[in-house]
């Protein structure tokens, strides 16, 4: 709380290891306004309303009312007509609720801009940077990131999607063609049950680094993993830290798919971060920003990827190639999506037209077209607009998204290092995790062997490496 921050700052005690923590406390004190307490309370109520509206959405599918997530498997169907029906059914509720969601966002927008002005800022974008303790990069850096993604990643994504179009043998790639396996291979079932899942994952992490493998084995032995999907279990996946015990806890809903393997690799990265940072004496010294937290998780996805084939890992050689190809293509696709979401939010809160619902929709289409190439949206303008209404971050966690892009660029550098010297790359990765929050973001990235960078030159080098690896894998799978 701000009151606790005031008391701690008033003590006047500081050391180099506490510098980042004290700076965060001072910033929280500086931007706090009593008048904003009811504003943020009202925003929480509006956020709950958004979740009620979207959480209750259903679609009729083959005579049954189904929650929208249950339509996802049909987007992978080899039957294109089935995919199109599933896509339209899943999008329709958002188009029907567009008026309600737009009205809800009108209120959120006004409250956020008011909170920013009451705290002495010109707009909510400018308020967010100190509020999120973004000390090491600026709004201008984010705009450089957008431009770099447009220049280097968007053309690569266009090439990836053109390859998909040719494999699917369609005249134009439509939005319902993006999830299906273009090779129409049999679905991969990497494990049968949670025992096999954890046993295999333990072997994988031991191959990455014996100390990381031992930490994961500790989680298995101490029952700090809840991985199976079951009736009545909350959705999603995450890693939580049990600070008193100095242990992480991983929660997810595994059903035996490739995505489950990648989710566990990701969450294990957070878990290894928790183990390493626990050596820092204070809780505040253990939690860096999301840019560093996601560096830990995204790097582990890539560091572990080389060990996922049998006899150590989950996949046959052919399955491993397919899973690796999908993962690397997803890395590129996600970067363009992240850039478009952040650029859109920047426009909303800095443009005089941000309060206008129609102008927001038009801006989304314009910005989306800037980054997203290779998909034919003709006749689907309303569906394309609906995409931002289901991006819950825009409604619930404004400006919390570019962190994923920044971390992905860092993780790709860690991965590049691992291709040259795997042991050294993992050692530096572990050194970075152990810093917790006692250093700034550039120093944490440097410890991991990466640069905190927003420029097109570095990003272009990494994209070239990813495309080279994609080409190598394609040459082996046909």
Segments (PLM) and residue ranges:
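A well-structured
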Residues: 1-187, 200
